[in-house]
């Protein structure tokens, strides 16, 4: 039993609130326990220079964290004049994950800009961002389809992500901050709804992990992500 009462194979309570912001074409508040992220999808009628004239679209992402999303205040990256390495890595991961399930030809020469803003962090912010950003992206694209601006939905399938790790020798699903900070192994899995992997990230913080431990974490991730697909589907049906 974990300190928050969950079993090893349990997700935190996950909530997805759609249409959270007034102006964005797609927006959600996603909550993984005490981790809360606002994800928006904004549609622009142009593409980056390297795609101009090719008849294909683009999806990209930015990620940030409010200064007091964490236990102590962090400095805004804008005040430093540059994006940090961690932020750059996470926003590239979010963009890759969403592009993996898109048919860019159906999007035409449009861009969708995803913004993931962490308003409260308790572990798993990147995986929550991916899971929520998919729903925001779906809503933005569905709006274009309903207005007749797109002939068909460019999203081919769903994508979601979850963290897993080993804490005190036990594989755990969906780590919160306390668990993540003391984990011997920390992994993130990104999967599509056709049971294919987009990305697997894993690091041994202490002892190297075995193939058997890797398999156990993979199985936890697969079961957790299947549940996340169901939560996404339920949110989109509301």
From Swiss-Prot:
The keyword Thylakoid does not apply. GO terms for molecular function: 3'-5'-RNA exonuclease activity; tRNA binding; tRNA nucleotidyltransferase activity. CDD domains: RNase_PH_bact (cd11362). Keywords: Nucleotidyltransferase, RNA-binding, rRNA processing, Transferase, tRNA processing, tRNA-binding. SUPFAM superfamilies: Ribonuclease PH domain 2-like (SSF55666), Ribosomal protein S5 domain 2-like (SSF54211). GO terms for biological process: rRNA catabolic process; rRNA processing; tRNA processing. Phosphate binds at residues 86, 124-126. The keyword Kinase does not apply. It catalyses: tRNA(n+1) + phosphate = tRNA(n) + a ribonucleoside 5'-diphosphate. It is an enzyme of class 2 (transferase). Its EC number is 2.7.7.56. Phosphorolytic 3'-5' exoribonuclease that plays an important role in tRNA 3'-end maturation. Removes nucleotide residues following the 3'-CCA terminus of tRNAs; can also add nucleotides to the ends of RNA molecules by using nucleoside diphosphates as substrates, but this may not be physiologically important. Probably plays a role in initiation of 16S rRNA degradation (leading to ribosome degradation) during starvation. Homohexameric ring arranged as a trimer of dimers. NCBIfam families: RNasePH. Belongs to the RNase PH family. This is Ribonuclease PH.
